[in-house]
Amino acid sequence: MVNVTVDPLTRIEGHQRISTEVDANGVITDAQSSSLIFRGFERILQHQDPRDAAFLTQRICGVCPLSHGLTATNALDELYGVAEHVPKDALVMRNIFQGLNMVASHATHIYVLFGPDLANPAYKKVLTPLGDTGSAVWDEMLGRFAPISYKMDGAAIPAGSSYMAAIPEKKRLQEMIALIAGRMPGPSSLYPGGYTYPATVADITKLSTYYLQVMDFVSAHTLKVDFNTWIENTYKASSPTKAVNFVTEHLTDLINKSTSSNDFSKEAGWGDVEFYAAFGSELVGEKLLGLPASLKHDTIGGYQDPSKICFVAYGGYYKPTDGYDPRSPAGDRIFTSGVVSGNLEYLKFDPDKITESTAHSFYQNSVNDLPPVKGETVPFTDPEKIVYTGGSDSQYSWDKAPRYDGIAGEVGPLARMLNIKEPLVTGLALALAENGYSPANVYTRMLARMQETAILAYELLNWVTVDYEPGGKISVPLDFNAAKDSQGMGLWEAPRGALGHWISTNGSGKVANYQCIVPGSWLMSPRDSNGIPGPLEQSLIGSKINPVGEVDYTNPVGIFHMGRSYDPCISCAVHTIDLTGKCAPNTLRIL
């Protein structure tokens, strides 16, 4: 047995360590997911004015500040009793904020955080011996996804075309948010009861111009098939079978045109989505399309025991009407709330079934498995107790272990697409399950993220040009007495998954307790009080460290793929702790 540890896993967004035990066949037999720093925002918010939560919590993460700001605002809407009265145009503008932020985040993940692993030399060793076709596929992967300052065998590799093109698009999307939200990151226009800046006709016109420029990137790099044709035949398909058939027929046409010339370029019709859809999966690429090889990403990152996992979505994006239900019942939002079991059975979502365990975390809470509204954040203060190498029976992470009805929950694009029964992703999940694969794996997670990006690009156009009406009502007044001895819950969908904020106030209307359960905690969580591993840990156990080729303990590309397929954001999950006593408590400095 060989210990293989990846530390850090994350390219940005905090510090995450994965420690695994691997057998002689390269199969992972045990795993621990450790978040290496402590998040103290819940303690910072105590005794603050509740309205500050919408601004302070945005500092939890610079990638998805809007998600935290919107979730906090949702909690404040309920705290002040105005959720049912928030004007339609305010809700539509919140949709635009979040949609732009999610597209920007997904593009960053696909091209900058996950994509570079497709240029890993492990794939060169597997593909180039397959002759001209294999070499052409490898050259295409390297030419699209190689990161900046990349070397292989001592030679400098030019940065990939898709990688480089995505970076200015991220900037453009940030500028779009700043135009209507005040600034990005850390927008200043969120407020309970609505939002603060009435976007003008000129703003909407400029936003539309930006949108067309972003869609130019999509057509040049991401999807080479006509965008509306893709949406009509996948997102709007009448059944999962029809969506999958459309994609496989489209890929078959591309293969028939490309195999004789070995041209898998964008100019030959291979957008990044088409390329990964064909070559990323053993089932799709090799068994359905007859390709000589694939990356076999559908063979790693799955769940061995479906009874120990579920797929949780809180629901996101308001319907264009006045008011909303803060508890997010099924059907209340465009992306509905829900729970899908590991066997793909659909269940009703109940926020009262959410708890957090600290049995394997660095906390000295008085009670385990607390609901978030009663949650505690009492960290270890003895540095001798903070050890990451004690194994699965020890306490080994700063992350808590959220559970839904006692079960570990995967959150994020795959969970959202399954819960809304999106035809393409649902069809792929069903096909994989029918053929003996886990319906959740690296391949389906990444395709779900790509598909969600396309769906949001489609929905954004409608929100910007149809649903939002300049000059409409954007806020309602607050009764500050309503926030005394009160509670609020904000349930929302961040790019990486279900995000919840819970707030309680005292008789003076100040924050008495504040708790966040973030996607990174759901996904990267350690074991719970029953010893059940978190989603990432479960997906590692039973998977190979190298999905293709020989076992290579020094280049465990499978671990990279599995960990990064969840788009881990440890900045949200954890922050920092001072064990020296040099920093005065309750001192907050905003730079």
UniProtKB/Swiss-Prot annotation:
Ni(2+) binds at residues 61, 64, 569, 572. Induction: Expressed in methanol-grown cells. It catalyses: methanophenazine + H2 = dihydromethanophenazine. The keyword Hydrolase does not apply. One of its GO terms (biological process) is methanogenesis. It is found in: Cell membrane. Keywords: Cell membrane, Iron, Magnesium, Membrane, Metal-binding, Methanogenesis, Nickel, Oxidoreductase. The keyword Magnesium applies. Its cofactor is Ni(2+); Fe cation. Its main location: membrane. Fe cation binds at residues 64, 572. PANTHER family: HYDROGENASE EXPRESSION_FORMATION PROTEIN HUPK, HYDROGENASE-2 LARGE CHAIN. Belongs to the [NiFe]/[NiFeSe] hydrogenase large subunit family. Composed of a large subunit (VhtA), a small subunit (VhtG) and a cytochrome subunit (VhtC). Part of the F420 non-reducing hydrogenase II complex that catalyzes the reduction of methanophenazine to dihydromethanophenazine. This is F420 non-reducing hydrogenase II large subunit. The gene is vhtA.
